[in-house]
């Protein structure tokens, strides 16, 4: 479980780091407006992938901490981590919403049509906020 979660975080961090490097190294490239727009569209796909990996890692980490609530000595530490994960998920869902709203390729898969739509991402934010305000505070 720990290895699985840590590997997902490593993949997400690898995407984030690679995107930062790519952005830094391509700032000074001379591109036409059309080329720059196309390049930025491709960057948004990579950012969406990074978000998805981080979200999967967050969700696995959330489940681990939730399931340990009854057995851990440091209940406040677990509660604090659950809050961090929910806040992270809200931030990720909002960013993914922005990316998907700008690029219909994000969240789309031809045979299933959509894995998720913008409304799903808004609902995720609401669900995370509900858990923060109504569940985490009561555990």
Protein language model regions, located:
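Catalytic domains of carbohydrate-active enzymes that cleave complex glycans
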Residues: 1-139
